[in-house]
Curated annotation (Swiss-Prot):
This is Suppressor of mec-8 and unc-52 protein homolog 2. Disruption phenotype: No visible phenotype, but slower growth. InterPro entries: Red-like (IPR039896), RED_C (IPR012492), RED_N (IPR012916). It is found in: Nucleus. Component of the spliceosome. Interacts with SMU1. Belongs to the RED family. The lineage of its organism: Eukaryota, Viridiplantae, Streptophyta, Embryophyta, Tracheophyta. Residues 1-14 have a biased composition (Basic residues). One of its GO terms (cellular component) is nuclear speck. Residues 15-39, 276-288, 530-548 have a biased composition (Basic and acidic residues). Residues 1-52, 219-324, 523-585 are annotated as: Disordered. It comes from Arabidopsis thaliana (Mouse-ear cress).
Length: 585
């Protein structure tokens, strides 16, 4: 605390001396005149020698050297000097660091002149006057020195005992401390600082694994070739034992990871199963590579799959977690009784019954290949003569010459085998598909016919204007003039009620609350069409035109009827001549 006070006194004394020196010199200088006369008393020529400028090779002209000195001198005004600069102090980082270094060096130099030596900041011990200041400093600056675990508050050591008998329920509980040996041992948390190079190597390894899942070959080191050869021998033995077990058991066994199986029964002596524990275990190969982060650790390999060259795939890098849950139709447990399973195609309700799995069981993969070979050329080939795009018009075109008709077959729980179905049943199923397409096509034709009507309004945007379709149909379907009383006519509406039409303010407010106003565009919807402006009188004109045409048809029919019966046609013509014709305005 004392050095700071002495420094403050020296600073004030220095300011007083500077003020006295400034009072002797003139307050302002004519710097423009100094620049015209090439005079600058602030800089001495001796200071220019400190700048080491790189001169061009060869003989240097004197004028070029002078120009270089002038450019260096002018550069001081752009932030090279503390006292003469055009930049704001603080924006020029080099200048800021220079000022800070000068401020730090000045007190040390002055103390050295006076013969006083100040200890470095690291050796200075902080002293406190009060206990509160010391505790605040310890908690804020160096909390690790005072934060210590209290053994009295270990987990399970201190308990509160409440006396619930004798009327002391509201009394303060008794504190009971257990022995430290009886308390459970607390878990110790260790903070480990990991080197950045180790983290980089782990990141590289993870990137290699990620690339390996896409089918790329992982980078192998030269010293791991011996381990790779041992892995290949283990894999070959694994394949041979697997093939032997397939031949002796007579069936292909696919083990599912998700399948829950009962405990295995004792193995019969005549069957050889895959037992890797009986094999001679290879001693682990120690890692001695300098670049390996796990130097000295043993190599603990698991039994590889059939393809050793495939890259490992971690659990979180699989395409979908549901793939493990998908059990094949032809899986069965590796041991225990064979469970009854429903095949992909259940037994048909008619035809020969297929042999059960216990009677004749062969490799189902071969059965699936045979089934696809039988279905691919034959079944679709029977319907190659159908042309669906041209047959969607009428149902009669779908029928073959030998077919009388088709019906929709009712749904059954039993799935039929296409190989065991008759031609008639196949036609029934195909006809139901065509009938469904015909219904869809009929709906599309009806919608197209409605859209040709000029008064038809599409319902594509009906969800944006709820309740508007009913309002629109009422306007279009009615022969009366539309009710324009609710149409918003704007501020210059004529015929509306105003404030002076009401006696009290309450009646005027009540009228405004009950008044309904719809936008004017809603009344004009459907009026303007593509072929010009059409009014709603078009509907009445069209009805009148239809009535006139019907009347003319009736007159022609009555005329022909009277001619056949021998009636008086002249009287009918005279009656038509007397009826006045309606003139079009």
């Amino acid at each position: 605390m004392k050095p700071s006070k002495s420094h403050h006194k020296e600073k004030t004394a220095r300011r007083r001396e500077e003020k006295l020196e400034e009072s002797d010199n003139p307050k302002y200088r004519d710097r423009a005149k100094e620049r015209r006369e090439n005079q600058n008393p602030d800089y001495d020529p001796s200071e220019l020698s400190s700048f080491h400028a790189v001169a061009p090779p060869g003989a240097v002209d004197i004028r070029a050297a002078d120009a270089l000195k002038i450019s260096i001198e002018n550069s001081k005004y752009l932030g090279g000097d503390v006292e003469h600069t055009h930049l704001v102090k603080g924006l020029d980082y080099a200048l800021l660091n220079k000022v800070r270094s000068e401020i730090v060096k000045k007190p040390d130099g002055e103390d050295g002149d006076g013969g006083k030596t100040s200890a470095p900041k690291e050796d200075q011990r902080v002293t406190f006057r009060t206990i509160a200041a010391k505790s605040v400093y310890q908690w804020i600056v160096k909390p690790q020195t005072i934060i210590k675990s209290n053994e009295m508050f270990l987990p399970g050591r201190m308990t509160f005992v409440y006396d619930m008998e004798g009327g002391y329920t509201h009394d303060i509980p008794t504190t009971l401390y257990r022995s430290k040996a009886d308390c459970p041992v607390p878990e110790e948390f260790v903070t480990v600082n990991v080197d950045g190079s180790v983290l980089d190597r782990i990141a590289k390894i993870m990137s290699y694994l990620r690339l390996g899942s896409s089918g790329k070959v992982l980078k192998k080191k030269k010293k791991e070739k011996d381990g790779k050869g041992k892995m290949s021998t283990i894999a070959n033995d694994y394949d041979e034992d697997d093939n032997k077990s397939k031949i002796e058991n007579g069936s292909s066994v696919n083990i599912s990871d998700r399948e829950v199986l009962p405990p295995p029964p004792p193995l019969p002596p005549g069957i050889n199963h895959l037992d890797l524990s009986t094999k001679q275990e290879e001693p682990p190969v120690a890692r001695t590579d300098d670049d390996d982060i796990f130097v000295g650790e043993g190599v603990d390999y698991t039994v590889p799959g059939k393809d050793v060259t495939q890259s490992p795939i971690s659990e979180d890098m699989e395409e979908s977690p549901r793939d493990k849950e998908k059990v094949s139709y032809f899986d069965e447990p590796a041991y225990g009784p064979v469970q009854e399973k429903v095949p992909y195609f259940a037994e048909p309700a008619y035809g020969p019954v297929q042999p059960s799995a216990g009677q004749e069981w062969q490799d189902m993969s071969a059965y699936g290949a045979m089934q696809t070979q039988g279905l691919a050329p034959g079944y679709p080939g029977e319907w190659q003569e159908y042309q669906y795009a041209e047959q969607t018009g009428y149902q009669e075109q779908y029928l073959q010459p030998g077919m009388e008709g088709y019906e929709v077959q009712p749904e059954t729980d039993v799935l039929l085998d296409p190989q065991l179905m008759s031609q008639e049943e196949k036609d029934r199923g195909l006809g139901s598909v065509f009938k469904r397409d015909d219904q869809r096509l009929q709906q599309l034709r009806e919608s197209d016919a409605r859209e040709k009507d000029p008064t038809f309004v599409s319902e594509s945007y009906s969800e944006c204007y709820p309740g508007y379709q009913e309002y629109n149909h009422e306007i279009v379907g009615s022969d009366e003039e539309p009710d324009l009383s609710k149409m918003d006519m704007g501020g210059k509406a004529k015929g509306g009620l105003h404030r002076w039409d009401f006696e009290t303010e309450e009646e005027w407010e009540k009228y405004n609350e009950q008044k309904e106003a719809m936008p004017k565009a809603a009344f004009q919807f459907g009026v303007k069409m593509q072929d010009g402006r059409k009014t709603r009188k078009q509907n009445r004109d069209r009805d009148q035109k239809l009535n006139n045409e019907l009347h003319q048809i009736n007159k022609i029919l009555t005329r022909k009827k009277m001619e056949k019966e021998g009636g008086d046609v002249a009287s009918l013509d005279a009656a038509e001549a007397q009826t006045p014709k309606r003139s079009k305005h």
